């Protein structure tokens, strides 16, 4: 039995990964044998070959655990982190997906790295999130929270969106485009990168605005301070608008309502192994060339 700075650990994942079964079982038994209380997300509880596990949903894990281990890819991490960011809990991922920008641990060496992490040897990194709100008259409603990005688009391919963008109530530009991506540094390596946006190091306190297929070549990606409030206004004759936060369920917007995006009060409390390096991670994930000099 080994001492751990974490008293209760949540194991989170999704059963769509066939190779997750062994990872779940091995990880659970390893933690259990160390005398650590383990809570399993209910979606994955059937993957275990034991009935001794404590079962709970993401909110239960957020309430009772002080570390969550997410098994899967970045999509699974985003799903879990969207809920867990509301709680005081640290998160790390075992990568069973493709790129895995947010899931650091290789399943083959995960237990070695986790052993060091349980002893307190890790890098702690806090990532900020974005809230999206709408205002209708004097009523303000939070529609969702994004770890990666907020995406504004229309459901019809033939129609472009026209909007005016304001930063801190100052008119900045108007645009006709297929949509707009508003990304955090965490999301700058996702859809925003594919749309021509820059990569932001997680330590950069910035928000990336990336027009999607703009009608004018002068409409370029820009980076603004993450303390800024972004607001979007639309003309009355506007096709049906849709918003997605981290590719979650679509949110349909009334064009007569003003949209606001700003930094959330919640954070994503990530931890990494001590040997983690963001730029080495980028080089591996994006296939950048090795040193040639």
From Swiss-Prot:
- Required cofactor names: a divalent metal cation
Which residues are annotated as active site? Answer: 74 (proton acceptor)
List UniProt keywords, sorted A-Z. ATP-binding, Cytoplasm, Kinase, NAD, NADP, Nucleotide-binding, Transferase
What Enzyme Commission number does this protein have? 2.7.1.23
What this protein is reported to do is described as: Involved in the regulation of the intracellular balance of NAD and NADP, and is a key enzyme in the biosynthesis of NADP. Catalyzes specifically the phosphorylation on 2'-hydroxyl of the adenosine moiety of NAD to yield NADP.
Cited NCBIfam families:
PRK01231.1, PRK03378.1
Which protein family is it in?
A: Belongs to the NAD kinase family.
- Which sequence ranges are marked TM in the entry? none
Q: Which Gene3D superfamilies match?
A: Probable inorganic polyphosphate/atp-NAD kinase, domain 1, Probable inorganic polyphosphate/atp-NAD kinase, domain 2
- Binding-site positions, NAD(+): 74-75, 79, 148-149, 176, 178, 189-194, 248
| Primary localization class, coarse | cytoplasm
Which biological process annotations from GO are given for this protein?
A: NAD metabolic process; NADP biosynthetic process
Q: Which GO terms describe its molecular function?
A: ATP binding; metal ion binding; NAD binding; NAD+ kinase activity
Location within or outside the cell: Cytoplasm
Protein name (record): NAD kinase
Q: What Pfam families has UniProt attached to this entry?
A: NAD_kinase (PF01513), NAD_kinase_C (PF20143)
- Gene that encodes the chain: nadK
The chemistry this enzyme catalyses reads: NAD(+) + ATP = ADP + NADP(+) + H(+)
Cellular component terms (Gene Ontology): cytoplasm
